[in-house]
Amino acid sequence: MPAIVLIGAQWGDEGKGKATDLLGGRVQWVVRYQGGNNAGHTVVLPTGENFALHLIPSGILTPGVTNVIGNGVVVDPGVLLTELKGLEDRGVDTDRLLISADAHLLMPYHVAIDKVVERYAGSKKIGTTGRGIGPCYQDKIARQGIRVADVLDPAVLAEKIEGALELKNQVLVKIYNRKALEPAEVVENLLEQAEGFKHRIADARLLLNEALERDEIVLLEGSQGTLLDVDHGTYPYVTSSNPTAGGASVGSGIGPTRITTVLGILKAYTTRVGSGPFPTELFDEHGAYLAKTGGEVGVTTGRARRCGWFDAVIARYATRVNGITDYFLTKLDVLSSLETVPICVGYTVDGKRTDEMPMTQSDIARAEPVYEELPGWWEDISGAREFDDLPAKARDYVLRLEELAGAHVSCIGVGPGRDQTIVRRDILATS
């Protein structure tokens, strides 16, 4: 059976948790393959219960699904334990969560350095969440990181942390005038935390490939979005990992030929958190309307999201760099009650028209949107369950987005609940 990749096709916050939750009952495995607790998924169950997840895959809320934190994720042990306890306190079975032995651990010095560097950056800061994600990935690439499996050997763990702090403390004390961290204290705290998760450590790549050989379905769940990818996003205003579909293989250990479907998640308008270019951003009453009606506040950061009209340029770009086969369009209901609904179909940069993503970041920053206006609709669509239940103008909007994005819109979200979804094509049946 196939592996299916689920990715954000904009700047994150597209509603990936809803998509995972919808598919979760028909898959056997859900894998988080990159990022850390710098992103969040919100899942609303049919009972009305609302869950905000940051590290743990959304499949944890579906009985019978095995969930994996893959090797591409950076794991803050304290956040992991807090999230597990929060789920267990609400009656969620967490026994089905495994953690790749090769995932990297986010350490206290990563958080300290992240916060102080961002503070000293002043006006040039990139809007990091301050959770240590970037510094942890830096250590991973520099081959100085602490892996999850290291907690199984206290002597090796102590040696690695002592070596890391020789340099980190120099940076904290001599450059930023901060207090040094005690290696023994860091080791002791981590080993204490490890008692709460070391029974979950597994050879994830082996288990996942064995599952595929047994014809089980594996859903690979990305965090953030395409335009935040460190290689393909609006650099330097990006995350430190690869949320794009290519990162799914690297961050899970599943070979690319195993992947048969790439499901992109698109919000019916566009949002972004933090700094960076955003060609369709709105600063008027329409932006305020989208923010209020869409509840646009970051799950992890609590920061208000910047809002703008749908940008077909970045949707086409996401289709291309991810090889997207299907789209899940979310929050279509938010656009009800608008007289017209503009779609960005291209840009002008220094007076020249382009329908593609500009090659340089300076050009993206100067890009002015070219809009095509579609008539809006006034009906409440939250009860629609079939495509034909939508008003004609809402259907026209979806079909135009589909045409511009270059991939089939297979699912449409018309509200936050799991059941508030229109399925036009069964993604699993076509995989």
Swiss-Prot record:
Keywords: Cytoplasm, GTP-binding, Ligase, Magnesium, Metal-binding, Nucleotide-binding, Purine biosynthesis. Binds 1 Mg(2+) ion per subunit. It is found in: Cytoplasm. Its main location: cytoplasm. Plays an important role in the de novo pathway of purine nucleotide biosynthesis. Catalyzes the first committed step in the biosynthesis of AMP from IMP. The keyword Chaperone does not apply. The keyword Cell membrane does not apply. Pfam families: Adenylsucc_synt. GO terms for molecular function: adenylosuccinate synthase activity; GTP binding; magnesium ion binding. This is Adenylosuccinate synthetase. GTP binds at residues 12-18, 40-42, 305, 331-333, 413-415. Homodimer. NCBIfam families: PRK01117.1, purA. Its EC number is 6.3.4.4. It comes from Mycolicibacterium gilvum (strain PYR-GCK) (Mycobacterium gilvum (strain PYR-GCK)). Mg(2+) binds at residues 13, 40. GO terms for biological process: 'de novo' AMP biosynthetic process; IMP metabolic process.
